[in-house]
UniProtKB/Swiss-Prot annotation:
The gene is dapH. This is 2,3,4,5-tetrahydropyridine-2,6-dicarboxylate N-acetyltransferase. The lineage of its organism: Bacteria, Bacillati, Bacillota, Clostridia, Eubacteriales. One of its GO terms (molecular function) is tetrahydrodipicolinate N-acetyltransferase activity. InterPro entries: DapH, DapH_N, Hexapep, Hexapep_transf_CS, Trans_hexapeptide_repeat, Trimer_LpxA-like_sf. HAMAP family: DapH (MF_01691). It comes from Clostridium acetobutylicum (strain ATCC 824 / DSM 792 / JCM 1419 / IAM 19013 / LMG 5710 / NBRC 13948 / NRRL B-527 / VKM B-1787 / 2291 / W).
Length: 236
């Protein structure tokens, strides 16, 4: 079934109807023989095996093979998860370890997603954009080309509470560290948001804003450009 990911109610419906999963990885010390079981992937030989499968299937397998197992260790990183993580194998971008990117996210060429960044369902990351460490792009957030979302910044999502207008960050925008862009706010191209700002209303192109709530303090000038330069080499 197709869902309209521009509509928060459709996203909620998708999450509601998605099959919830609790995948496990299990290390087993024991003699499992050929180690065949429905819906479980088993790798190993002799007395060591690694199992992959859903929690209920794994539990049943471990119980039925209890007399052959000396000990086991379970790794689990989610419970009743509705949305899988994105398949990164075909994305032409730099994605560092520890980034969490949910499925149904668009990531442009040469984008950079740093450690600890979180990108939620329906988001669009433009070509050459950088999502820095521990930054959050909420549901349906739109990040322009070569934009920089600073460490710890939050681009608010529009899933709960539901809103039809997502945050939109224009091309070549720099969002300073630990800034918050509230739901539905649009930031014009080439603007700069000072670190720690809370932006509650739209920002035009080519200005610098700062404060809580954020206010325009000046237009972007040569001095500002020098301090907020986007480095292409980081996107190669």
């Amino acid at each position: 079934m197709n869902y309209d990911l521009t509509n928060p109610y459709e996203i909620a419906k998708y999450i509601k109807e998605a099959k919830k999963t609790t995948p496990l990885k299990v290390y087993v010390n024991g003699n499992l023989g050929d180690c065949t079981a429905d819906d479980i992937d088993c790798f190993g030989t002799d007395d060591f095996y690694i199992l992959f499968g859903e929690s209920d299937k794994i539990s049943a397998f471990l119980e039925s093979h209890g007399d052959k197992i000396k000990k086991f260790k379970i790794e689990q990183d989610r419970r009743n998860s509705a949305i899988p993580l994105i398949d990164m194998t075909k994305i032409d971008a730099r994605i560092e370890p520890g980034a969490i990117i949910r499925d149904k996210v668009s990531i442009g060429k040469n984008a950079v997603i740093m450690m600890g960044a979180v990108i939620n369902i329906g988001s669009e990351i433009g070509e050459g954009a950088m999502i820095d460490m521990n930054a959050v792009v909420g549901a349906r957030g739109k990040i322009g080309k070569r934009a920089h979302i600073g460490a710890g910044a939050v681009i608010a999502g529009v899933l709960e509470p539901p809103s039809k207008s997502p945050c939109e960050i224009g091309d070549d925008v720099l969002i300073g560290a630990n800034s918050v862009i509230l739901e539905g706010v649009k930031i014009g191209a080439n603007s700069v948001i000072a670190a720690g700002s809370v932006v509650v209303e739209d920002v035009p192109s080519g200005v610098v804003v700062a404060g809580t709530p954020a206010r325009i303090i000046k237009e972007v000038d040569d001095k500002t450009k020098d301090k907020t330069q986007i480095m292409d080499d980081l996107r190669k």
